[in-house]
Amino acid sequence: MNDKQRWYTLSSTANTFNGANLNIVWDKENTYWSKLASTSSYPYPKLNDSKYCNELGNLNKLDICQDLYWSADGTSLVAINDDYGIRQYLIPESENCDNESMLVPFTRTFSPRSIIASALSPTYSLFNENRSGNMLLISGRDVPLQSYQLDTDSTSCSKPSMTYNTLNDKIERYDIIFSMIFINSSQFITGSVNNKISLYDVRRKEPVVSFDRFKREQSSSKRKSIISCFIDRANIDCNNRYPNIVYFGTYGREMGVVDKRMASQRRLLNFQHGNGVYQILPSFNGHFLYILHRSSNTIDIVDVRKDNKVINQLRIPYKIGTQKMKGTLSETNGLMLGTDYGSVINWQSDMIEFGGLASDGSIVKDYQQSVSECLTSFTGSRINIVQQCPQGNEYFAISYSPDKFSDSDKTSAVKSGISLLRASID
């Protein structure tokens, strides 16, 4: 690799989520919270308990962060965990790399059931005077889609603020929402089975429009007809470039596009590798889409200006398995993706903004020449989420864990958690 960069840990959950017993995790978290609350002049709201905290069985499992979000102002994080937990973290003010601080939940609440997918409003901040902008959407099985208001007290997420109709009249059951994303602060879009996509207004229970024309076009397909993801819209410039269209991926190895003006969707690509698209990252200039697949070691690069054709590929130095490894892309830092051995690989911005090509337009085939590596202190763990702070190019939040689908990794010795890191060139 061209160069190696050291990322320094500023704050982390330390050993809170280590091991494979949820009761032990919750007890450690309560202890850390009590120590923090007793030494702080600020009245920290009491952490809520899971309704399963008194159960003796079925709690021997990993507690991995499945979704991680920055607030718009970069002052807090929201984490969705496998223990059905919804946690808000305030970012510590100290930036001393030699004195790592403890990342303790500011609020902790629990969904009564497992969370399949989530989406956070782009206007979220713990410091919002108007809490209506702090909307979190969560989906589950056999329940309608629900939204919650994230607040600064122990009542945060105690009950839904809105319930949205996802009932499938044909089978008299609720559609399972596998993916969703806010288009803006007042609209969001959802994806479910049979390649069904629905557009909602946050203030209305019924969808503005639902359509599955894509499903009928592909009715002969034997692969899973599930909308697996939508284009990552954390990039503000991307929102300006795509105000009315939304790209999406499926577990059937396809990519398509929705045009909310015409209430239509169409298939653009059918990939020949991997086991389903799970993330679509746009370049900052809006010209390219970076497509990540399960069970693959390749990132496809799609040029939206050339009939949405794959014009290049980036090779990953390991094979992504069933557990998703979510990356981040920015104008300053390019494309960053965690590895299964505790580092972060980085394709520089000047290459990413030109479709992964060299300055002379040629395709760089040698992996060693096209990527650098960022070293962390989490050697041996999988860094399954990398999120850049929206207010600081050198700050990152990550989730690290063992392989959740490997039985050998479900022991008391495994390490999981969330960490706040700062990049610095050696």
UniProtKB/Swiss-Prot annotation:
Involved in mRNA splicing. Helps to stabilize the U1 snRNP-5' splice site interaction. Associates with snRNPs. It comes from Vanderwaltozyma polyspora (strain ATCC 22028 / DSM 70294 / BCRC 21397 / CBS 2163 / NBRC 10782 / NRRL Y-8283 / UCD 57-17). This is Protein SWT21. GO terms for biological process: mRNA processing; RNA splicing. Its main location: nucleus. GO terms for cellular component: nucleus. It is found in: Nucleus. Keywords: mRNA processing, mRNA splicing, Nucleus. Belongs to the SWT21 family. InterPro entries: SWT21/TCAB1_mRNA_Telomere (IPR051150), WD40/YVTN_repeat-like_dom_sf (IPR015943), WD40_repeat_dom_sf (IPR036322). Coiled coil: none annotated.
